[in-house]
Amino acid sequence: MYDTDQNINTKITVQTLAGLVFNSILKKANLKLKVRRIHLGAKLPLQNDELHKDSFDENEVTILYYTAKEWKKEWGGETIVSNERVTYVPNRAVIYPSTELHGGVAPKTANFRTYINYVGIKI
């Protein structure tokens, strides 16, 4: 939806809403970042992510925001960040260096594991 490296800027309403969520997270976490990328994601069972890095730039930070309205722990859908499992909890923002290996675990339910993935540059 938005990526400065790939010159993507969809300018759709959901992009504006995602930007508002980003700014709210920054304020609550007391972070100063300039957004570089916004991706929306939705995964179903069997859709495990490969472990990957969002960036190789030490000045970039990833914010993974879980968007599901309801989620039960037994549904799984954790995120692995540097070999640590982070439980999917609605309205949770997971913040980590973009250089960290991470990946999402497929849910054990027919419900989508939804999220917004932000990459920001420290300012």
What positions do the PLM features span?
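Intrinsically disordered, low-complexity boundary segments flanking structured domains
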Residues: 22-30, 51-53, 67-69, 82-83
